[in-house]
């Protein structure tokens, strides 16, 4: 959550529209407006980068629930439950690999970040008296074809094993795959095949993000297969 860090090539989003939210208060006003126009009850999923850092340089391996107590209180006032996401992209240590990085220092940085995010999710779940769903998606991959597909996936598996070993009663972990990230089109470490196998073996929820499917994919194929 380094303030002002540039968005890396792994994640692209729009946001330069006139009247865009300039701070968290305005973002909450936008959410309240949207919520007022929709029927039903919704949950709000926050990425770690949306914490309230008060202008302090709190790095992602230092984040705590203190940066999200404002969100928790606001969500309670809105009768809205919170879910959570770790954030591996748009950081000087993001590069092309995070949890699957062969460099122990970088890998441990992201392992610690993800562990802290799970603890934040647990605190959210306890506060709202309803489990917080904590999603883990990492951008890890390669622009060029690699001959070490198995190696990177083994590293990712070991990182996830360490992260998920901590039992937290007020949150539920889930893992998200993606066909590829922009700038990493040749190889994705956390592919659908990898996560389907990992989640089935370890009894972990599998996230199907219907907004992130590519022209070569159809989410109904994944849903119909995973429901068996």
Task: State where each predicted segment sits.
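Catalytic domains of carbohydrate-active enzymes, especially glycoside hydrolases
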Residues: 1, 16-49
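Short, small-residue-biased leader/transition segments that mark boundaries at the very start
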Residues: 2-9
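Short, flexible/disordered intra-domain loops and linkers
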Residues: 10-20, 53-62, 146-148
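Aromatic- and glycine-enriched glycan-recognition loops and surfaces
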Residues: 19-29, 58-69
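Short, well-structured secondary-structure segments
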Residues: 39-56, 81-85
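Active-site acidic/histidine proton-transfer and metal-coordination neighborhood
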Residues: 61-83, 87, 91-205
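Short, catalytically relevant binding-site loops at active-site mouths
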Residues: 180-181, 212-215
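A short alpha/beta connector and helix-capping loop motif
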Residues: 214-228
């Amino acid at each position: 959550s380094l303030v002002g860090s540039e968005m890396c090539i792994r994640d692209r989003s729009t946001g330069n529209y006139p009247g865009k939210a300039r701070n968290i208060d305005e973002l909450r006003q936008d959410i309240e407006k949207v919520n007022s126009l929709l029927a039903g009850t919704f949950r709000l999923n926050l990425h770690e980068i949306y914490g309230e850092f008060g202008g302090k340089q709190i790095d992602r391996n230092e984040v705590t629930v203190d940066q999200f107590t404002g969100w928790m209180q606001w969500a309670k006032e809105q009768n809205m439950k919170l879910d959570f996401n770790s954030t591996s992209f748009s950081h000087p240590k993001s590069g092309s690999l995070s949890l699957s990085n062969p460099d122990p220092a970088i890998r441990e940085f992201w392992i610690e970040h993800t562990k802290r995010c799970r603890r934040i999710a647990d605190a959210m779940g306890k506060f709202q008296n309803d489990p917080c769903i904590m999603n883990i998606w990492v951008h890890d991959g390669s622009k060029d074809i690699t001959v070490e597909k198995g190696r990177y996936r083994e590293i990712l598996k070991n990182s996830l094993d360490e992260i998920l070993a901590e039992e937290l009663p007020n949150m539920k972990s889930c893992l998200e795959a993606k066909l590829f990230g922009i700038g990493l089109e040749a190889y994705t470490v956390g592919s659908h095949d990898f996560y389907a196998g990992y989640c089935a073996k370890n009894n972990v929820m599998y996230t199907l993000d219907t907004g992130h499917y590519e022209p070569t994919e159809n989410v109904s194929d994944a849903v119909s297969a995973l429901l068996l």
